[in-house]
Amino acid sequence: MNKLFSAGALLAALLAPAPAARAQAPATPAQPWGSWVILTAQLPGGAAHRWGGYVELQGRSQALARQFFYYEAKGGVSFDIDPSVTVLVGGGHYSTSDYRALDDGPLNTEKRLWEQLVLTQYAKRLKLEHRYRIEQRWFTFRDDSTAFRQRLRYRLNAFYPLNKKTITAGTLFLSAYDELFLNPRGPVFERNRVYGGVGYQLNKHFTAQLGYLYQANFNYSGTGQVVLQNTMAKNNLVLALTYKFARRSDAPGQELLPSQQD
């Protein structure tokens, strides 16, 4: 009972920013639920081999498992400075379309680079991950116009194993995060993502996660206004499947946090 209470308190604490985010501006009328499907292959770093990396494919839909309009393919190379500090350089290609007119081609495509720092904390069962990211983004629109933007991101991710003390083979766990997106050119507070879900690590290779993600995008209603007055928000069901490659030199039962790379 104490374990379940602690896990519930953890999820409640991390999901608490969601109402606050909604309160900053009136949200648009209720929209249908969307869905995200994320497929990831990862080679984790470690004590013996500090270099790692991953590749990922992702699709997003306007409705549950249909009306897909957004696709991305990305990857990165990571280096473990020590067991609790990891740096990564990544890049990807992103495509956004009108789900009602897919034959017309993408509304815009994006090429993105980013630099990332991840700090990990372990407090008995509870694991906390702080992720800091700087992004450079090059857009090409349907009319052949282009744009360049930058963005800063911070994500606090918490993990709590339910049936073991560590997240290893055969572990059922909870995961929750809140991520802020900041735009140096404004609006400064561009986006907020709040996620809560459950996952299961089948063995040293496969992990599956299913969760709820609330995403709110904030825009100024007029140039120079300080108060955010226009909000677009959406609920999403997220399915994430991860395959981790294992090295022969990896320690048996090594704990690797099941972080989503998005």
Residues covered by each model-derived region:
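Residues on the lipid-exposed face of transmembrane beta-strands in outer-membrane beta-barrel proteins
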Residues: 39-43, 75-79, 115-121, 154-162, ...
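Outer-membrane beta-barrel "beta-signal"
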Residues: 117, 233-262
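Residues that define the transmembrane beta-barrel architecture of outer-membrane proteins
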Residues: 31-37, 69-71, 109-113, 146-154, ...
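Outer-membrane beta-barrel transmembrane domain signature
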Residues: 131-219, 223, 262
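Transmembrane beta-strands of outer-membrane beta-barrel pores
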Residues: 43, 57-63, 91-97, 121-123, ...
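Start-of-domain marker
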Residues: 24-86
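Short loop/turn motifs that connect adjacent beta-strands in outer-membrane beta-barrel proteins
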Residues: 45-52, 84, 122-128, 162-172, ...
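Membrane-embedded beta-strand positions of outer-membrane beta-barrel proteins
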Residues: 53-57, 89, 117, 130-132, ...
